[in-house]
Amino acid sequence: MALIMKGKPVADAIYEELQPMTSLNLTLGIIKYKGSDAGGYLSGLSKAAQRLNVQLRVNEVEQFQELTQSVVVMGKDSQVHGILLLKPFPKEWNFRQASDLIPPEKDVDALHPVNLGKLAQGRGNLVPATPQAVLSILDFYNVLPLEGASALVIGRSEAVGLPAFLQLMQRNATVTVAHSRTKDLPSLSRQADLVVVAVGKPNFLTKDHVKEGAVVIDVGTNVLEDGKVVGDVDRENVEPLVRAITPVPGGVGSVTTACLFKNLFLCYQEQTR
């Protein structure tokens, strides 16, 4: 019977670790597109912020120029300790141009080229929140020694796939990255002790993709037409085969939020050195 690696105990442990934050009166600046459907995520951030006595300063923008201006203003404001660009934004906007304007020491998403470069060199404190959550879950439940393990990351985004690859490699796992052009994915994934899937497609990973006793981390969050939230894994059919699996909802997402506030604390420490 598979171990269900729920996110709440992991997130609670991180919040406990972050209790020193409560006396610091930190502020997280959030910039979102006016009218976007990010309300649910913002609500989760708000609850976590209250728990840690963090103030949220939310700016809503309608034009790309407003976005870049808001980033610059918050970047110069000493009372703002971290900046988060809350997706989604219009597809035609140059998101990377805007995110690159965030000072590296205020980059709670850890996607600035400076922070990703340091991560690649193995000397970065800031790690993108979602892959940081993946490692936190694996460490908390301790179901698989990463050293020497065969790991497959499905998805190569700079927010999840790339940093997950770097972190797992630095933990001495043997890591392969798969993507939309990968040939014969099932035969590749059936060799993996650990599968991390982040493709944004409901029920993408089936029982044909996993070997018996593997560990599966489902990063996906997909809303079906009937409103049901599911992951990238066909959990009903995969779960009976594997040693451990994260649920959706209730898995990686809540830990990602906690890791975001951990990054805010690290940003503050960087700014006050």
From Swiss-Prot:
Entry's Gene Ontology BP terms: L-histidine biosynthetic process; methionine biosynthetic process; purine nucleotide biosynthetic process; tetrahydrofolate interconversion
GO molecular function: methenyltetrahydrofolate cyclohydrolase activity; methylenetetrahydrofolate dehydrogenase (NADP+) activity
Top-level taxon of the source organism: Bacteria
Keywords, ordered alphabetically: Amino-acid biosynthesis, Histidine biosynthesis, Hydrolase, Methionine biosynthesis, Multifunctional enzyme, NADP, One-carbon metabolism, Oxidoreductase, Purine biosynthesis
Catalysed reactions, semicolon-separated: (6R)-5,10-methylene-5,6,7,8-tetrahydrofolate + NADP(+) = (6R)-5,10-methenyltetrahydrofolate + NADPH; (6R)-5,10-methenyltetrahydrofolate + H2O = (6R)-10-formyltetrahydrofolate + H(+)
Binding positions for NADP(+) per the UniProt entry: 155-157, 180, 221
Disulfide cysteine pairs (residue numbers): none
Pathway, per record: One-carbon metabolism; tetrahydrofolate interconversion
SUPFAM superfamilies reported for this sequence: Aminoacid dehydrogenase-like, N-terminal domain (SSF53223), NAD(P)-binding Rossmann-fold domains (SSF51735)
EC number: 1.5.1.5, 3.5.4.9
A GO CC term assigned to this protein in UniProt: cytosol
Listed Pfam families: THF_DHG_CYH, THF_DHG_CYH_C
Record's function text: Catalyzes the oxidation of 5,10-methylenetetrahydrofolate to 5,10-methenyltetrahydrofolate and then the hydrolysis of 5,10-methenyltetrahydrofolate to 10-formyltetrahydrofolate.
Oligomer status and interactors: Homodimer.
Family assignment from sequence similarity: Belongs to the tetrahydrofolate dehydrogenase/cyclohydrolase family.
PANTHER family in alphabetical order: C-1-TETRAHYDROFOLATE SYNTHASE, CYTOPLASMIC, C-1-TETRAHYDROFOLATE SYNTHASE, CYTOPLASMIC-RELATED
Name the record gives this protein: Bifunctional protein FolD
Gene it is expressed from: folD
